[in-house]
Regions:
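Non-catalytic terminal extensions of ATP-dependent helicases
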Residues: 302, 321-322, 405-814
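A short beta-strand element within the Helicase C-terminal
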Residues: 152-155, 327-352, 381-387
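Conserved two-lobed SF2 helicase motor
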Residues: 128-144, 299-313, 319-339
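Conserved interdomain hinge at the start of the Helicase C-terminal
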Residues: 224-250, 257-260, 314-323
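Conserved segment of the helicase C-terminal RecA-like domain
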Residues: 344-347, 351-354, 359-404
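Conserved C-terminal RecA-like helicase domain
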Residues: 91-93, 101, 108-117, 252-327, ...
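Helicase-associated low-complexity/disordered flanking segments
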Residues: 1-62, 267-298
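Conserved P-loop/Walker A NTP-binding site and adjacent catalytic elements of P-loop NTPases
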Residues: 35-222, 226, 244-270, 304
């Protein structure tokens, strides 16, 4: 058996992965695993858990259709342990990266760092480990590329109800159809009737499928429909001891609005607030939203949604797991397996916007959310509350005010639902409670990428694609359509000479690629090959070369929708002001306004190039370009992360911006060939790395620190603070660019004569609005204007003194201002606090001045 330091308390009970003998018998595996469960975890397993693990040890597939909180994770642990003991590589798949990441760290804790890896398309950690956590698409693409040769011994598919998702369901169905020698554990609390799934899996693998769907809910639920305002509902729950409460919203803005409202109503006790303050003592809330979150947390109110920085989201989860937060306001991401233990779920609505229209919640969606109520081991029951629509709450308030006075009751004017409003009532709630999750309707699609993955496997790819369609759980009409789509794709690939065939001796055909394909082309940035081709259109001698390369990279990235909406809103506001000044009539202003959108650099060039590329490279038809300017905008305006958030008023979406910058960094660093990089591009790549790491390094840091701390408050602090630096300056080039950008941004603001903005930036180091007003008055007495062109931004006008880097952890900097007369007698000077700057991602000064030499 292996040592616990490297392999965790459970991993140490299995043979090391590199040992020759890894074939422990099933009885011994059972004894070791359940001995660990009782002795180390201190848990008494339920009968359905023992049954499921015995079925897995017998070699059967298991469909675990049991309620939330019924211990599905323990069964998955048993499967991973059995795989380790028998020399098989096991996989855990989930629909979202956050859940994959959470499970990765959970498994590292019990199996050890050496035994667990993670692959999410943009993150690869220990990818050769015997236990792999990944998104469903990662496994599906591997199954298509490798088929039954894939080194996939067994798979735990979490949230298997996603197989019914119209866009992504194919990724849950494909492995079941293409990995006949793999053992599957399919898990969800809301699968509904699974007979068809079990029959299909048994038919495809010739292996028994055991369905476990009779496990009792460990914590029963009670339900309430209320006409009370939300604040009163939360207050009553707090008084009755029905905390912690998760208030479910269907938009991020609504979640924050409620959190800020509840923070002023006293939802926590003095003792709770003191405990929270102690737990977050070491946490650095460096961003605009971070400061909002800090205020909320100190009142006992948490917030949780996908627009937050990952480190803040995981901090809230950790505080909730410690039982420190009485109330969390969040979105319905709660229903996707995120580990936030709660007693009560309060739904602010029974409708949601699904991307096209408002509609009522489906039974599966409702049970996914409601099922999170009730903490096993703490609660005897969980509470699910649904709020009535706001107009009904107002009506109830008016009726209550009238009391039992018939005359007053007669005068009450009842409000009606707003026009077009999708409403709900007590009956809606009752039906959702009683309704079983809808029977899953599996989805399948055929794309160029899927076909090319099959061709990569070798052999008769066409036959395998036809079999994939025929074996799928689709209707005959759907299968016919899929076959037609496959015909189109294969014909296009033949016409463009991307694939060829070779006849075998037995008369069959082998398919092979006739072009070089990038590794993992369908997993990471699928348009990387287009980017490489498009770069040839640019002139490296052009002054705009670096910015245009950035624009080409950005066009291949997923849109950060909240950021682009903010850009569009600002552009339209500015255009409206100009049109009013020009005297345009209202109707004409409205017509022109519809044509204004966010910046799309190189749009015409890129569209023409991509049209040609799709003709030459057919698999590109699965994707599309989306020109935009976020990184370019930040570079051109010398913006840092905080300044950009402030400029577009997108503090609520800073997590979205960070993810986008992280994607841009990876694409620039991985995809653009070295011979296409100039010094400015290398500067931008280094700068992006510093920004991304300093704003949120939680994933890398938690991996590096996994298992290193048992102290809860220390662990919480580590999630919200940058990682320890091996040297005073970790990335010299990136940090230099960050500082130069910050100083030149001030030069740009001097050109615009913005003392208020400059004062807000520099008041902390003694240069507030009044100081800047005096400096600007003196400057413009001597010079007519400030230059902000490329020459003004050049390295010749920036001075850096590093002599106190090691002893004082500081740099002295000087940005010379390129004035209208070319005197260069004015400058911004300062001493940089290197530690604070690197930890916050924005420049922090020890001292600062605007000087006239």
């Amino acid at each position: 058996m292996a040592d616990t330091e490297h392999y965790g308390s459970l991993g140490a009970l299995a043979p090391a992965w590199d040992e020759g003998e890894r074939n422990i018998d099933t009885d011994e595996i059972y004894e070791r695993f359940f001995g660990w469960v009782t002795d180390v975890k201190g848990v008494e397993p339920w009968p359905h858990q023992e049954e499921a693990i015995m079925d897995l040890l017998a070699g059967d597939h298991v469909i675990l259709n049991t309620p939330t909180g019924s211990g599905k994770s323990l069964v998955a642990l048993g499967m991973h342990f059995a795989a380790l003991c028998t020399g098989r590589r096991s996989y855990y798949t989930a629909p979202i990266k956050a859940l994959v990441s959470e499970k990765f760290f959970d498994l590292v804790e019990v199996f050890g760092r050496d035994n667990v890896g993670m692959i999410t398309g943009d993150t690869h950690i220990n990818a050769d480990a015997p236990i792999i956590c990944c998104t469903a698409e990662i496994l599906a693409n591997q199954a298509l590329r490798e088929g039954r040769r894939a080194d996939v011994g067994c798979v735990a598919m979490d949230e298997f109800h996603y197989s019914g998702d119209s866009e992504r369901g194919w990724a849950w169905q494909v492995p079941l159809l293409t990995l006949p020698d793999t053992q599957f554990l399919l898990m969800s609390a809301t699968l509904g009737n699974v007979d068809a799934i079990a029959d299909k899996l048994e038919d495809m693998t010739d292996t028994d499928v055991d369905v476990i769907a009779d496990a009792p809910r460990p914590v029963p639920l009670t339900y309430e429909y209320t006409l009370d305002p939300l604040e009163k509902t939360v207050e009553l729950a707090f008084r009755k001891g029905e905390t912690p409460i998760y208030v479910v919203h269907f938009s991020q803005d609504a979640a924050l609005d409620t959190a800020q409202s509840l923070a002023s109503t006293g939802v926590s006790s003095k003792e709770q607030r003191q405990a929270i303050a102690e737990a977050i003592k070491g946490v650095k809330f460096t961003t605009a939203f971070g400061k909002i979150l800090q205020r909320l947390l100190r009142t006992g109110v948490g917030i949780h949604h996908a627009g937050m920085l990952p480190r803040y989201r995981r901090l809230v989860e950790q505080l909730a797991q410690q039982g420190l937060l009485p109330v969390i306001c969040g979105t319905d991401t709660l229903g996707v397996g995120i580990n936030v233990p709660i007693h009560s779920v309060v739904l602010t609505a029974l409708t949601k916007f699904d991307g096209t229209k408002m509609r009522r919640l489906r039974a599966r969606e409702f049970h996914q959310i409601a099922g999170r109520a009730g903490r096993m081991g703490f609660d005897t029951e969980g509470l699910v509350v649904a709020e009535a629509p706001e107009y009904e709450i107002e009506n109830a308030k008016a009726v209550a005010k009238a009391g039992n006075d018939p005359k007053k009751l007669k005068k009450v004017k009842r409000k009606k639902a707003p026009e077009g409003f999708v409403t709900w009532n007590q009956s809606t709630f009752d039906k959702l409670i009683d309704a079983a999750p809808e029977t899953l309707v599996p989805h399948m699609k055929i794309t160029h990428s899927m076909v090319l993955n099959e061709v990569t496997q070798g052999g008769d790819a066409r036959r395998r694609v036809d079999e994939l369609i025929d074996d799928s759980a689709q209707t005959p009409d759907q299968k016919e359509h899929l076959h037609e789509r496959a015909d189109e794709i294969f014909q296009t690939l033949f016409d463009t000479k991307v694939i060829e065939t070779e006849e075998r001796d037995d008369g069959g055909l082998d398919y092979f690629l006739d072009v070089d394909m990038p590794d993992d082309f369908a997993l990471d940035q699928p348009l990387s090959p287009f980017l490489l081709a498009a770069l040839e259109l640019l002139d490296p001698e052009s002054d705009m070369y670096a910015l245009d390369v950035i624009s080409m990279v950005e066009a291949t990235l997923e849109d950060p929708k909240q950021v682009l909406r903010a850009q569009e809103r600002q552009a339209r506001d500015a255009a409206m002001i100009r049109m009013k000044e020009d005297g345009l009539e209202y109707d004409e202003r409205m017509d022109r306004l519809q044509e204004i959108t966010y910046p799309k650099p190189l749009e015409d060039m890129l569209d023409a190039a991509f049209d040609q590329y799709r003709h030459d490279v057919p698999w590109a038809n699965d994707y599309w370009l989306s020109p935009k300017s976020v990184v370019r905008d930040m570079v051109e305006t010398a913006s840092d992360f905080t300044g950009y958030i402030s400029r577009y008023n997108i503090a609520r979406s800073e997590g979205t911006l960070l993810r986008y910058l992280s994607d841009a960094y990876r694409a620039l660093a991985r995809t653009v060939p070295d011979d296409k990089l100039d010094d400015q591009l290398r500067d931008v790549i280094s700068w992006l790395r510093v920004v991304v790491r300093s704003i949120d390094s939680s994933l890398v840091d938690e991996w590096e620190n996994a298992g290193a701390s048992d102290d809860a408050s220390q662990a919480a602090a580590s999630l919200a603070a940058p990682g320890a630096k091996a040297a005073v300056v970790e990335d010299r080039r990136g940090l230099t660019v960050l500082i130069r950008n910050a100083l030149f941004h001030r030069v740009q603001l001097m050109d615009l004569d913005k003392p208020e903005t400059l004062g807000a930036l520099d008041k902390e180091w003694g240069y507030g609005v009044h100081e800047w007003e005096d400096a600007l008055d003196d400057f413009y007495d001597e010079h007519e204007y400030v230059n902000t062109d490329a020459k003004a931004r050049s390295a010749e006008l920036f001075m850096l003194d590093e002599k106190h880097e090691n002893d004082e952890h500081s740099w002295h900097v000087r940005q010379i201002i390129d004035d209208s007369d070319g005197d260069h007698d004015w400058a911004i000077t300062g001493t940089i606090d290197l530690d604070a700057t690197q930890s916050s991602g924005e420049v922090v000064f020890f001292d600062y001045a605007v000087t006239n030499d």
